[in-house]
């Protein structure tokens, strides 16, 4: 069956809803803040009261323009708003204000690394719209919280330019990182700040046809996205294989599904609506949104260094491995931490390992982010410098790192001043004595080494380091051990 599956490929496009981190909502002065008591951040506009009129939030427009500039899209000098009509309890007006025909951004692309290769994922458009409220279920009844109603969104629509789950996850990851870098959203997927609607169809490999697509709604996890895409891919392929003589348009009807993580399958929600079902028409209460080139350029000039550009710089300036550079730039706060530390430590590879592996592992067990742990970048730089200068051994450095996690305000130097017993052995006569004891206790290993078995040397070094509790300088141990063995 897997060989049959290999003859098919997925065609995937994503619609990403991004909540903008403005202080107020898109068309009213109601507060835009997650987690408050239900129905406390509301106004006549976002609850659809008769006679209330929308007023466009300038900051939301600025953030949408900033996104357009970041993806090198075409920011429209003229765009407008439309009403998308539908009835649902969380939409008190019975319509959404969106941009159907004239979006604020057209085109653009997102750069990503997929399995070590550089990829560009093309965008169709990005438009501004307001969010709906939220239904909360309580046993046999449900309540509606309108705190989210009217929260500003940009919906980012990709072209169907992804052909497997890995592509989709790489694009989504790169997009969220980009949004975080430019600071237009808090990108908290658990709180729904970024939600993915995934459109997927399948076709015989080598074909260029676009068959009926299925939409999987409201994905808020990269892992669930990958699982859902693979499950839906298999479902559609099996349907086509079971109905080889049917018109493909009738085999997979356009529909909306959700992902059930417990059953590991997509579940039908409803058949797909057509655009005309929403009865789009121009929003009569909002004027055309008119921008100037000067205003767009002013916003473009505020763009920070973007993730992919930072990734390339890390490869070039710091000579880091691709996987390490990718880990560092995936979190802008960690990247900033690393750069501050790199200003004081030139062993960039060792430093990156301490940031992404040693301290990252310790922080993960405590549910922390190194950038917010209280540990200073200069302290991590000092730790690596101490290793390079022979002030401490690698074993001592790890013990120091543990103590830094407990007392983040203290530098390695301060900890060593308080605990001089942690410093490495400097008494060579004592070290030579330990080496002699180890050689006497491991005569067979000495014979093996002299017979050309180099692994025996590593064993002897390990025994010496064990006796010294990791405090002996490894380079000096090797020198003295070889001198003793050559006698």
Swiss-Prot record:
Belongs to the GatB/GatE family. GatB subfamily. One of its GO terms (biological process) is translation. The gene is gatB. The keyword Protein biosynthesis applies. Pfam families: GatB_N (PF02934), GatB_Yqey (PF02637). Gene3D superfamilies: 1.10.10.410, GatB domain, N-terminal subdomain (1.10.150.380). This is Aspartyl/glutamyl-tRNA(Asn/Gln) amidotransferase subunit B. It catalyses: L-glutamyl-tRNA(Gln) + L-glutamine + ATP + H2O = L-glutaminyl-tRNA(Gln) + L-glutamate + ADP + phosphate + H(+); L-aspartyl-tRNA(Asn) + L-glutamine + ATP + H2O = L-asparaginyl-tRNA(Asn) + L-glutamate + ADP + phosphate + 2 H(+). PANTHER family: GLUTAMYL-TRNA GLN AMIDOTRANSFERASE SUBUNIT B MITOCHONDRIAL AND PROKARYOTIC PET112-RELATED, GLUTAMYL-TRNA(GLN) AMIDOTRANSFERASE SUBUNIT B, MITOCHONDRIAL. It comes from Chlamydia caviae (strain ATCC VR-813 / DSM 19441 / 03DC25 / GPIC) (Chlamydophila caviae).
